[in-house]
Amino acid sequence: MFATPATCDLCAILLPDSGHIQEEDAGFVNRHGYTKHAPALPLYDKHQAIQSLNLLHPQALGNTFSPIPGWKVTLTSAGHILGASSVLVEVAGRRILFSGDLGRPDDLLMLPPEKPPRADTVLIESTYGNREHPEENVIAELGAALKKVSARGGVAVIPVFAVGRAQAVLYAISLLKERGDIPHGLPIFLDSPMAVHTTALYKKHPLAHRLDAQGIRDLENVATMVESTDQSKKLASRHGPMVILAASGMATGGRVLHHLAHYLPDHRNMVILTGYQAPGTRGATLASGSGIVRIHSKDIQIEAEVVQLQSSSAHADASQLIDWLQSMKQAPSQVYVVHGEAEASDALRQRIEHTMGWRTLVPEHGSTWPT
């Protein structure tokens, strides 16, 4: 497996945790009889995940390497999260470019995506292929919410993804404190071991993002880092005002569930949603204005205020995807639109064809196409 150095370091954090979750899920369905298998087995366990790390071969951005004879591969920065890259494959005289998830040019932490190299075929993501980011400033949005909940002595619970979103919110909070937009003494807690370990990688990979040395220090020092379960439980005995960031970002699992169950029934408190909430998740239930959410087999009354930030996505929007394509010095012979909901992918296909006149296709799942 080949990846950027930062991605390799993230895998060392994420994969063992994923294996542990697989084991827990298998154990749960076995205990409750929710399986046709006898017994249900994890797809992989923590030990196997750790062993797989030996297969990783870090490759620097811009370095061309040969994974197998006859193939050349070059990674360029995609600007999405730490270590994210686009992939140029050169084989049999053809140049095939995979965009990967592309970031925003104005991202709070990440540098803009690199301009794409010349390619015969491009596969471009379309997560936001039919959407534009609103012009609201995410720092101002967050500041207004935190100032409001702090003034009434409440607790703000912020569900975050451990990689990327947690660090962006932490850095935004550090800027708000520096400007005096929120109280400098407002206690902040990052309650996610995975997010704590990921935050440390920004110091290890200073060229993989836009933060300077002071920015990295601000990122590391703005919050109390909570790792142990006992430390996490003790937060429930504290009184507001305070802010708790915890995974997961859509409230599908993790420590944030305990905080939501504890703080949702109090009208002084606030839940701040920082990104897209997929249908069927607890985050989507919170965003919908529902009065009840189910957590740990109990119906929890939602009395806390729920705020959803409108401009915090780390994905390039439709116009930014078009700008990335238009920065190519030479038009490709074929573009394939991938990695998006059907409506988003088709909207981006139409826009590419209309704007640039390039041959563009949304391939069906399982179909085969020439490059």
Residue ranges and their predicted role:
Residues 256, 335, 360:
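Hydrophobic, well-ordered secondary-structure elements that form the walls
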Residues 321-357:
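C-terminal structured "cap/appendage" subdomains that terminate the fold
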